[in-house]
Amino acid sequence: MAKQKKHPTGTIAQNKKARHDYFIEHKFEAGLVLAGWEVKSLRASKLQLVDSYVLLKDGEAWLLGSHITPLMTASTHVIADPVRTRKLLLNRRELDKLAAAVQQKGYACVCLSWYWSKHMVKCEIALGKGKKEYDKRDTERERDAGRELQRAVRNKGKED
């Protein structure tokens, strides 16, 4: 009897800049249409999501700006395009909700992360409202204040 292969689990890559630049309001899980060489590269975590975003066009969602570095051993017979536009698989209801929200000023649809769900690659996309410069500074101040508080609590425990 053949041994069952374990499915890879966990996050492949995250877009930390998206959380810095946007207030995340709603999250969606989307499937992806990928080529074989892309899946092999994803198993090796060769993915960058820094400037990736979602474009809604003709009732479909497309992911632009994600970069999958091709493995030399996996893409020998195919001309690999690392930054090609990839189709996202969403329900009609989710697509309609995203399309209506993106029409409003200041809202955008961005990719937050890619992860394995059983043997499938999923993309977590989010509807976010763009942060202003002062919002980013406020977030940084709150984070620093939280760190100072944790540091004070930790030091207080050591003094006793």
UniProtKB/Swiss-Prot annotation:
The keyword RNA-binding applies. Its main location: cytoplasm. GO terms for biological process: trans-translation. It comes from the Bacteria. Gene3D superfamilies: 2.40.280.10. SUPFAM superfamilies: Small protein B (SmpB). It is found in: Cytoplasm. Residues 131-160 are annotated as: Disordered. InterPro entries: SmpB, SsrA-bd_prot, SsrA-bd_prot_CS. One of its GO terms (cellular component) is cytosol. Keywords: Cytoplasm, RNA-binding. The keyword Endoplasmic reticulum does not apply. One of its GO terms (molecular function) is RNA binding. Required for rescue of stalled ribosomes mediated by trans-translation. Binds to transfer-messenger RNA (tmRNA), required for stable association of tmRNA with ribosomes. tmRNA and SmpB together mimic tRNA shape, replacing the anticodon stem-loop with SmpB. tmRNA is encoded by the ssrA gene; the 2 termini fold to resemble tRNA(Ala) and it encodes a 'tag peptide', a short internal open reading frame. During trans-translation Ala-aminoacylated tmRNA acts like a tRNA, entering the A-site of stalled ribosomes, displacing the stalled mRNA. Belongs to the SmpB family. NCBIfam families: PRK05422.1, smpB. This is SsrA-binding protein. The gene is smpB.
